[in-house]
Amino acid sequence: MRAAAEHLTPVTLELGGKSPCFVDRTADINVAARRIAWGKFTNAGQTCVAPDYVLATPDVAEALAERIAVAITEFYGEDPKASPDFGRIINDRHFERLCKL
């Protein structure tokens, strides 16, 4: 950033974030579940806004977890491995690299 500032160069910092989701009884559980599942699984979860935490009040937590599971099944079917839409690691080299993280 210092080098960019010295030359008035625009800079964008990707700071990441843990992107928590908070769900309580005022939320539409079905909508929240679909959006959480979509956000996490889009691009195999490799986006800066993919939710990493779901915080839910006790009165909705179980229903939300069930609806997220339903949403994942709706998006990718009963067998995600057979779904062309389910993100994958593309080769053994990348798989090994990720295992070392």
Please identify what each model-predicted range represents.
Residues 1-101:
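ALDH superfamily catalytic-core signature
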